[in-house]
A protein has these predicted regions:
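Hydrophobic core segments of alpha-helical transmembrane domains in multi-pass membrane transport
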Residues: 20-28, 53-64, 83-93, 106-120, ...
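C-terminal ends of transmembrane helices
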Residues: 1-5, 58-72, 112-123, 196-204, ...
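Inter-helical loop and helix-membrane interface segments of multi-pass membrane transporters/permeases
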Residues: 25-47, 68-69, 76-77, 85-122, ...
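Helix-loop-helix hairpins and the membrane-proximal interhelical loops
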Residues: 126-212, 416-424, 433, 440-456
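C-terminal transmembrane helix-loop-helix hairpin of multi-pass membrane proteins
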Residues: 118-124, 167-179, 303-457
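Early transmembrane hairpin of solute transport permeases
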Residues: 1-110, 242-254, 258-285, 292-300, ...
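Membrane-embedded helical hairpins/re-entrant loop segments and their flanking transmembrane helices
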Residues: 1-5, 176-250
Length: 457
């Protein structure tokens, strides 16, 4: 392109899928193996994870051929608002709590990041703010006793990757793909949509990448990971605007690859994690979350701001549901020897006017819900009511398929059930009919974009 300011797409482990595959695939597989007296339940869990990773990569690869059409049909506010909600809830809020739990390290490093990245100043000598924050944070963590958090590691050496094709074939023949299809398919689809949103985020920051090859390589990388023993899919990562604002360009991704390869294959990653605690760098991650959230407003038309706000709410609700369940586990519920999660929780939370049923419903497929609500809102703002109704009916269809809002109770969690979520499907259908009838049941209350009754987006 001749440009010197292009930032490469971030790439790494998909955190959402990691937790889904650990707790909804690998743990059940291990427990089932233990109940049948298998000789090596841990190996059974690993093989089930391999199949899940391979399946996710295949879905991502196939999805790359249709993803650009979805992207063109979806307003930018809908794509970016979902990332905004994830950035605020699952990135910024978690690290904000940690910052104020350990204020000496947290607030000091946050001040440095605010000074250099929000204030647009540099330290004398050309020292980058991120390096200063991590170095000072590490020093303060050791002085205050936060570090080290564990005993000194040992076992450095050379550990080259080994293909596990035979194990993967054995896992496929064992039928794990069919057993855990209800988890693999939704996670694969979520990865496709999430990657789409991150590509849109990169374009909003000034770096346009083609959708098909980006997602295709993403899927191929995930399948390659499974061939070498990884249970966790890779993804186009959230955070491109933050990395670009840090000064990262095309080379940072290559350097990341070389560095992570070196420390992982030599076993030295454990030493780095021991010496440099998470607290030392959490201000940078907090800042990246803020930048991602801000971009959703800065890179979209001003009058679409309500759509962005509505689109980020399901992700915040999902984060709230996770926090509520973590609190219940901390109190002993869902833990060994404690009471299981049951439907009685809905009534118990209701006594404090907490509608936890809604939070659990929003948690399932919140990436789809966020995108659809924001897209429908954009259409309503622009008075394209037929388009808004189509988005609502898409949500109704996803509800019938169980990809959003449908959940079931497990002793330790609430998880996606893939059963029809009829109440929500009906609600979305009626919502769509309301928008469809808008031209006959409403009158203009003020100036705005002309109504478009076409079915285009």
């Amino acid at each position: 392109t001749g440009r010197s300011d292009v930032c490469a797409l971030p790439y790494g482990i998909n955190t959402v899928s990691l937790f889904a595959y650990v707790f909804l695939v690998m743990l059940p597989a291990k427990m089932a193996a233990e109940s049948t007296g298998a000789a090596d339940p841990a190996r059974v869990a690993w093989e089930a994870g391999l199949v899940a990773c391979l399946g996710s990569g295949l879905i991502e690869f196939l999805g790359s051929f249709v993803a650009e059409r979805v992207r063109r049909a979806t307003p930018r506010a809908a794509l970016l608002s979902t990332l905004s909600g994830i950035a605020i809830g699952f990135i910024s809020l978690g690290f904000l709590l940690r910052t104020f739990a350990r204020p000496i390290v947290g607030l000091t490093t946050l001040g440095i990041i605010m000074l250099t990245y929000f204030g647009k100043v540099r330290f004398k000598g050309g020292l980058p703010g991120g390096l200063v924050a991590v170095a000072l944070g590490t020093l303060l963590a050791w002085i205050t006793g936060i570090a080290p958090a564990a005993a000194s590691p040992h076992g450095a050496g050379i550990f080259l990757p080994v293909p596990v094709i035979g194990d993967l074939l054995h896992a496929l023949m064992s039928g794990y793909g069919l057993t855990y299809m209800a988890v693999i398919v939704p996670m694969g689809l979520f990865n496709v949509v999430g990657s789409l949103q991150n590509i849109e985020s990169a374009e909003a920051a000034g770096d346009a990448y083609k959708t098909m090859p980006s997602l295709a390589v993403n899927g191929l990388g995930t399948m390659a990971a499974a061939l070498f023993g990884s249970c966790f899919p890779t993804t186009i990562y959230i955070g491109h605007p933050g990395w670009k604002a840090l000064g990262a360009r095309a080379g940072y991704s290559v350097l990341n690859g070389f560095f992570m390869t070196a420390v992982c294959l030599t076993g030295t990653l454990a030493y780095i994690a021991w010496a440099v605690p998470i607290d030392a760098g959490m201000a940078i991650v907090l800042w990246i979350g803020i930048v991602i959230a801000a971009q959703a407003f800065e890179a979209t038309p001003r009058h679409h701001a309500p759509a962005v706000v509505l689109g980020l709410l399901p992700a915040l609700a999902a984060w709230g549901a996770m926090m509520a369940k973590n609190g219940l586990r901390a109190a002993g519920m869902g833990m060994p020897g404690g009471p299981p999660f049951t439907e009685a929780l809905i009534q118990a939370f209701g006594k404090s006017d907490t509608w936890i049923h809604g939070a659990f419903a929003l948690e399932q497929g919140f990436i789809f819900t966020s995108m659809i609500l924001a897209a429908a809102t954009v259409a309503v703002i622009e008075r394209r009511f037929v388009t808004a109704s189509l988005w609502c009916w898409a949500a109704a269809a996803l509800s019938v398929m169980g990809l959003i809002h449908s959940y079931r109770w497990m002793p330790t969690d609430t998880v996606m059930s893939l059963r029809p979520a009829w109440p929500w499907a009906a609600g979305y259908a009626v919502m769509g009919l309301t928008f469809l009838a808008a031209r006959w049941i409403t009158t203009e209350a003020g100036a705005g974009p002309a109504e478009d009754t076409s079915s285009g987006a």
